[in-house]
């Protein structure tokens, strides 16, 4: 039996369905999802373990990336750094496009990035469930894209309904080289639970607020204490203006309570443990343009700081 493995980068414009595909492939909710563009701000690793089929077993390390865009803030630039770092050293790119919308310069920008990497590319035409009865339109898109690049595979699918996902898995394992098992079989991501909790809270902010508020907020976990029967979490939701703070808190604190309740239930489902969640809201004017603050939002940087603090205490 041969064992195949490799790193696969999921690339696409905002709202192409990248995070939905990651969750569908792994079978767990690793990436938050909302109808709002640029929901994903960091690259997220999803580890897919494939059992032996026809003499081949494998491990696919999927990398979900922020939506490709031309940045206009420190946050946007950091997101594009995440994209470019994900492309480095990957074995395969899954370029996702929204088949239900007309191709434009944003899709061409994504394709240019993929071409520059020199890595083999699968073209995934997502959201085909929205094209029922429009097969000529889908075939026309496939023909048009095929003239722009020599794709390794072209696969129409619906990540939301999991149509075409089995075919994608088959083609993935065929395309990846023989290699080692990079992660243990019981591991499905590299993200610590405390940082996944921050994303769950931010997801509820995205779902329960509108206009500029979702884009002007971020979440930092201040305390995360875990025991067998209870996880205690204290988190701060940062926004940029007092008016946004008022919206997040709501009348008599009702909005913040609703966000906290929904997030707590989701974290309990994720961890299988009862959760006590305490939320605070603070104003950090212009945080999206503060390179220092944006860098501190990186969970890998936060993990390094926590490790350093723990070592200092031990001394």
Language-model region placement:
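Conserved G1/Walker A P-loop phosphate-binding module
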Residues: 1-89
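Conserved glycine(s) of the Walker
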Residues: 17, 164, 255
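Conserved, well-folded catalytic cores of nucleic-acid-processing
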Residues: 28, 47-51, 86-93, 148-151, ...
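Active-site glycine-centered loops adjacent to acidic/histidine catalytic or metal-binding residues
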Residues: 64, 126, 158
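Conserved Switch II/interswitch segment of TRAFAC-class P-loop GTPases
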Residues: 87-109, 118-137
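Amphipathic helical hotspot of TIR/SEFIR-family domains
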Residues: 104-116, 218-224
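Canonical P-loop GTPase G-domain recognition
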Residues: 119-120, 129-189
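P-loop NTP-binding site
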Residues: 193-315
